[in-house]
Amino acid sequence: VKLATDRLITQLHLRVESAKAGHDMKYEQFDFESKVLHHQEHIQRYLDGQHPIPLNIEIDLTNACNHRCSFCVWATYIGEVRATLPLGIVISTLDELKALGTKSINWTGGGEPVLYKGFYEALDYSYQLGLENGLITNFSLIREEHDDQILEQLLWARVSMAGGLREQYREIQGVDDFDKVIANLKRISEKRRVQQSKLTLGIAMLVKPGNLHSVPDMVELASDIGLDYLQLREDMFISPPEKAWWKKQVIPVFNRAEKRAEEIGLKLLGAKYIDTQEYLNLPSKCHAHHFVLGINAEGYVAFCKNTRDNPDFYIGDLRKETFSNIWEESLKKREMESSINPISCATFCKNMGINKAIEDVVQCNITLPLVDPEPPVHVNFL
């Protein structure tokens, strides 16, 4: 218990000292373990058994997608279930979420959010409610007439690009939209500079054997465009052979990329996962759904955002009942809260960072509030 307490307090103090020294954090907005600890009132309500609504909701507006990424974890699901969430359900659910205490919305997929006919209407409605908004997109469908809305109403946009060269991009994403995406990024980046928009704009590159050699090109590209960051990340469902390849082949490339990024002033970020079985054995249960949750394009609310393609994890249907009723009354939710054990989850599950942080607080019987340093960037997105 003492070790866990020391680790928790030290973690918060290190962030304070790092901020004072002006050091960049390696993960920053992708360090979910640190971010969740800044929501101490929410954590306390959860520990008191009040079942607070998730702070961050991921919404799949549609399963339609104009790309065919070879690494897409939802490919089979969105190919078989061509669903689109009715705009009326989106609007009414946003009203509920805001009233109940949700702070932020991830517009994601599923499919490509911008393909959804009512995307900009939904984004505007969410923004006018006072919710923070982020977008995960391939950025190929961004039209100039919507630039000003994007710059004003999105807190961040993360663009999925599978290669720093056209050929690798085409092979992995299944379409030849490389030039189109680059043009959109350059246009938005320049307008952002002129308008002094607070939009954070970056690229996330899932590194695979087929695109590893284009990492240096991606570093140069991201810098030339003027992006805030480049995130290089592994597949959360990485296999044991791929882990060995990662350590032997990828890490040296990353080290060289990091050195080059420092030279040209580009922020190079990783993806912070719990990657050892040791930590999967730690949580007594999964805490994450009280902090982040997923809604799929069929209207199902999933117990875990990573299982929104799996009916076994659906706790309710927004086409039949309200979110608040699902959250308060779902028998499936109660059953899963008592039965789900993280030891059976993937080691690279992003929710494990949240679980680890909350379990530290639970095991140590720590009285909140703890140290409250300057909050990390995009603290409401978990």
Range-by-range predicted roles:
Residues 100-108, 127-136, 155-161, 179-274, ...:
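Conserved C-terminal portion of the radical SAM core fold
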Residues 65, 69-72, 286, 304, ...:
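Short cysteine clusters
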